Amino acid sequence: MEDNSEQASVSSQASMRPLVSDNGDREAGAGVEVNIANDNDTSVGVDGENGNEDDDPILSKYHNACQRGDLEVVREMIHGGQVNVSSDADREGVTGLHWAAINNRLNVVDFLVREGANVESKAGALEATPLHWAARYGFVYVVDYLLQHGASATTTDKQGFNLLHLSVNSSNIMLVVYVLFFVVSKGIIDIDYVDPKGRTALLWAAYQGDSLTVAALIKFNASVKIADEGGFTPLHWGTVKGQPHVLKYLIQDGADFFQKTNDNKDCFVIAEEMSNTHSFQEALRHNNFDKNGYPINKLVKRDDHAKIITFLIPLLVLGFAFFGFSHLHILFALPVIILLLLASNKFIKSFLLPSYETKGTNSASLLKSPLIAGILFGSIFWLAFVWILRILPYTFTKRPLGNLTFCAILCFVCYSLFLLAFSDPGHIGSENDHEKIRETISNLLKEGKFDTRSFCLETWVRKPLRSKYSYLNDALILRFDHYCPWIYNDVGLKNHKLFIFFILALELGIFSFVKVCLKYFDELDMDGDCFILGDDDLCSGLIGDRFTFLIMTWACIQAVWIFSLVIVQLFQITKGLTNSELNALIREGRRVDIDSQTHNEFFNTVPEGFINNKDTEEEAAPPVRNNTNERISTTFSGNLPKPRTCMGMICAVTGLHQCVAIIKDTFGIARHGSSRSTNTRSLLSSISTDYGWRRNWCDFWLLSDTNTPLWKRIFFSPPSTKALLNGKEADYATLYEVPNKNHGSVSQLQELQDPLSEIDDMV
């Protein structure tokens, strides 16, 4: 039975594979050879050239020129009468337009179409049009051009594939998005159109393990219920592939994992046969199903209630820990506290996190829960508790100023923590108007910037520079700095300044608390020998009030990472970059052996020679070599991401890895500890928003409204999406180009210096 089942699965997978030949469907199953005319040219050809050199050398030369994008040769041959564009096909029907389309030669495509080339001519064993050839390799700009010049999106090849199927098969998410909005949204092609074997675009995307395409198709209401001729639904094929994100999306959209194929197999059987049980069960857990597919009963029914409980648990655990270590022997207290921590961790992970609402494929985690914010709140609570009930009565008469100072800082910290937790970091929400989205895509295509750097796949809006999508807020965060677990919110344009005041107040508050604590311990006047603590105030505190002593020690430990955070934040302000941008620079510095010409993580298929007058040399998108042996892919490994180690989580929470990176860069230490070579570029040398420390600080601390009083400009956060950048007001919601740091005008310098003069006068 097992052998028959495995054989059935193998045969089902074999039937699933499309008939694809990398020579553009010219000969089914024929091999591809990449023609390299020179080091900078990569073209798709067959058998070294175009396969017909012996038949017609002139036609062969013409087709080779179309492949290479040699517009001058193509123009000369057509205008010279050597080739007639209306009859330039070889014996297989392949035209110059086919070769130009499959090699992403938009300039040649444009010329041939203007000369009268037939955009609907079919070629090869699959009878594919130039549009099909371009779509199979994800060339968005060629597809857009051909559609605008008469190519039909509904035409199918011999396999029964239309433009939507071929776009999905290309695994270029940008082409899929383009087809969805310009073809499917207009009703030209049905989202659930099936090929002759009953397979929809969603079914193909699931089989390919293409999570981005699956998510996009589901947003367009693609059916997860339709089964092909073998009884396989998208979830069945997704289980065959085992890509976790694909499975999560499909189950989240209501796919039936109990449904059986014609071979009487459900997803559980297929997952076991394909060794994808772990990924499948992870997807089930993500959507609140147990390993058998039955709903998990939630201990807490509401998401907000579960988060409140998570937030309050550290308050109780910290109090119990301080009490235990101060009243019990350490050999008894330590194992009890460890067991309490383990039990709390197990309770949160098993009963509270499953009650959280999940968004997309992001599962709830401790780092993305209110737990860390609860630790900060609990620490502040117990610190305030001992100050009010124990320290204040002893020290107020002798240290009134110190106590009043601490009280003021404590009130500000509590108030700002509340504001930060519920603040708007500055966001752009999702766009639902398809007409506006089409306009955005069209503008990006004209500028040669239609890729994931400039277009947000989650919100369907153009990405402003320095923005980043946040799953927590389900929006693009303007001038995104980082997600801070200590406030359970993102830090961005509108709350970044308050965040800086908050962490500065925390550090000053701890320093002030330690001072009044030491005075309190001095008032206790307890004598004793405390080994390394000696017989001073610390020893008096340890003997006389261990509970308060432990809280002061805990506060000092927190002061270490807060100081690290303050240093990193002030350094970033000085350099004119955000935490997110610093992380990106660190990641870029760790990359090795990546060919920038072939590595295309942003799915950019802008043709070589694409002219965009708006682009500066610095901002222009890098050219992408059109090597069709290296398909653009939005698929990911079937393996789940590695969980954070304990040290990794500590570094993520405290930002210590950034301090290390800054120190290494400052002292010129290379990655492996050796001196930085002259060929190694500094991490911080390519910051496009670094206009000098003086200007950077003014850009950050001053509001852009010059009519506002100076003290408000310094202490208030931006009320809108506008802020200073290089001394001029910039709207971060529409920030698509940064001011050139080398061409500041006199008016910009004057506007920058005026506030500084006011500050000097005040001092």
Swiss-Prot record:
| Residues in ANK repeats | 57-87, 92-121, 126-155, 159-188, 197-226, 230-259, 292-322
Q: Which SMART domains match?
A: ANK
The residues exposed to the Cytoplasmic compartment are 1-307, 349-368, 423-497, 568-763
Q: Which reaction does it catalyse?
A: L-cysteinyl-[protein] + hexadecanoyl-CoA = S-hexadecanoyl-L-cysteinyl-[protein] + CoA
Major subcellular site: membrane
What does the entry give for GO biological process?
A: negative regulation of pheromone-dependent signal transduction involved in conjugation with cellular fusion; protein targeting to membrane; regulation of endocytosis
Region Disordered: which residues? 1-59
Tell me what this protein is called.
Palmitoyltransferase AKR1
Q: Topological domains (Lumenal): residue ranges? A: 326-330, 390-401, 519-546
Catalytic residues, chain numbering: C484 (s-palmitoyl cysteine intermediate)
PANTHER family noted in UniProt = ANK_REP_REGION DOMAIN-CONTAINING PROTEIN-RELATED, PALMITOYLTRANSFERASE HIP14
Return the domain comment text from this UniProt entry.
The DHHC domain is required for palmitoyltransferase activity.
Give the family from UniProt: Belongs to the DHHC palmitoyltransferase family. AKR/ZDHHC17 subfamily.
What's the protein's topology in the membrane? Multi-pass membrane protein
According to its record, what are the GO cellular component terms? early endosome membrane; Golgi membrane
Q: What are the record keywords, sorted?
A: Acyltransferase, ANK repeat, Endosome, Golgi apparatus, Lipoprotein, Membrane, Palmitate, Repeat, Transferase, Transmembrane, Transmembrane helix
Subcellular localization? Early endosome membrane; Golgi apparatus membrane
